[in-house]
Curated annotation (Swiss-Prot):
Pfam families named in the record: Ub-RnfH
HAMAP family xrefs: UPF0125_RnfH
Stored SUPFAM superfamilies: MoaD/ThiS
Superkingdom of this protein's organism: Bacteria
Organism: Paraburkholderia phymatum (strain DSM 17167 / CIP 108236 / LMG 21445 / STM815)
Protein name according to UniProt: Protein RnfH
Location of region: Disordered: 86-110
UniProt family annotation: Belongs to the UPF0125 (RnfH) family.
Residue ranges with Basic and acidic residues bias: 88-110
Length: 110
């Protein structure tokens, strides 16, 4: 086993992605990796009490111990409710007359 772990810390905004690679000692937690990366000073809008964190798309608590080659991800809160966004997409496709949008209409009104 190596003396250090290679870990990446990732935070993505719509127009900018931050990916920082670190060498950290074994037994390091998710919170320690985020602090060591400096991503909190680079992006002061990150609030770890509101933003969820994870490793490779799986939600993890801040005290989770990391393994070698883990990618720590900081997730932004959702801007739009997923159910509402889907309803808007269906309405838009109905208005545009696409086959996908019309499949939800009764057969006699197609």
């Amino acid at each position: 086993m190596s003396a250090h772990l290679t870990v990446q810390v990732c935070y993505a905004l719509p127009g900018e992605q931050t990916l920082i690679q670190l060498q950290l000692p074994p037994g390091v937690t998710l919170r320690q990796a985020i602090d060591a990366s400096g991503v909190l000073t680079r992006h002061p809008e990150i609030d770890l009490t509101k933003h969820k964190t994870g490793v490779y798309g799986k939600l993890k608590p801040l005290d989770a111990v990391l393994a070698d080659h883990d990618r720590v991800e900081i997730y932004r809160p959702l801007i739009v409710d997923p159910k509402l966004a889907r309803q808007r997409r269906v309405e838009k496709s109905r208005q545009e007359g696409s086959v996908e949008g019309r499949k939800w209409l009764p057969k006699d009104s197609r």
